[in-house]
Amino acid sequence: MRKGFRDFPEASFIPYNATFTDGLFAIASDESSDRLLRAISAVLNSSVARYWFLMTASSWGVEREQLHHREWMSLPLPPLSEEQVEDLLWIVNVAAAGEAEESWRLRLDSTVEDVYGLTPVERQVVADALTIRWSELRSGWTSPAYAQPPDDYFLAYGTALQTHLDALEVGIWDVSITERSHGFAMMTCRQRDDRKFDESTDRQFSIQHLISVDPLKQDAWFSSATIIEPEALVLDGTAVHLIRPDRLSCWMTSTSRDDAANIFSALLTGDVVDVQDVDA
C-alpha cells in the first residue's frame, strides 16, 4: 500500500490495548466509546470510505509515491443515529463471526450511504468509481472497463438518461441504443409526438455517416499507442444521437445526467450536423 495504490485499506475493531507498527494507524478510546468505535470501523470499510480514499489519495499522478492512512481516516463522519449504530454493530458482529463478505456488504454500503444522505445519483457515482474507474486506473488498457457493455447495461443507461431528459421538461423522450458498429455505439433520444416514427421515410443517421466525414481520422480514433475516446452529439430532426466508443468506460450510468445537460445545451444552441451534408 505504501508504494502505489495496490488495494483499499481495511479497518478492524480491537477490544483490547494494542501498539501499532509503521503502516498501521488507530483511533483509540476508553470502553465508554466501544459501540461508536465499532460503528466507525464499519463506516471505514464501506464503499463511501473507499470512494473517499480513491478520490483524495491522488495516487495515479507521478507526483505521489506514497499513500498515508491519515488521508483515509480524514473521512468526515456525520452524527450517527442510534438506529444506524445498531445496524452498523450488527454488520461488524456478522463480519467478525466469519461470515462471507457477500452476506453483509450490500447492507453495509446501503446503511453508510443513508448515513451520509447520498442521493441515487451520488450513489451511482460511487458505484461507478469503485468498479469501472477503479478497474480502469488499476489495470490500464487491459481493464474490463474497455470491454463492450452487455445489452442490459445499455438498457439501464438509457433508462437513466431518459429520466434526466424528461426532468428537463422539454418534451417526453424515448431513449434506446440504435446501433453498435465500427467500434462505436449510438444512443438515440427521440422526442415523442403525435406522428409515429416511420423508418422508411424519416431521416436515418448512422455511425457510417459520421465516419465517412473524414475517414483519415479513423486511424487516430483506434490508436494502439494511447486510449482515444472520441464522441459526437448529432441533432437529427426530432432525434438526438449520442455516439461514443463501444466501451463500458464511455457509458457510465453516473454520467447520464451530464449527458442530458449536454443534449439540452445542444438543443438551445442549435448546433446541428446536417445528414444531407454528411452524405455528400
Predicted regions and their residues:
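Short, ligand-facing micro-motifs at secondary-structure edges
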Residues: K3-F20, R38, A42, A49-E63, ...
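Active-site proximal loops enriched in glycine and acidic residues that flank catalytic Cys/His/Asp
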Residues: K3-F5, A28-E31, L44, P76-P79, ...
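Extended hydrophobic-aromatic, low-complexity segments
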Residues: P9-F13, R35-A39, Y51-M55, E83-D87, ...
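Active-site-proximal structural scaffolding
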Residues: N17-F20, S33, L37, H68-R70, ...
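Basic, amphipathic alpha-helical recognition segments used for DNA target recognition
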Residues: D22-S74, S81-Q84, W251-A280
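Non-catalytic DNA-recognition/assembly elements of restriction-modification systems
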Residues: P78-A280
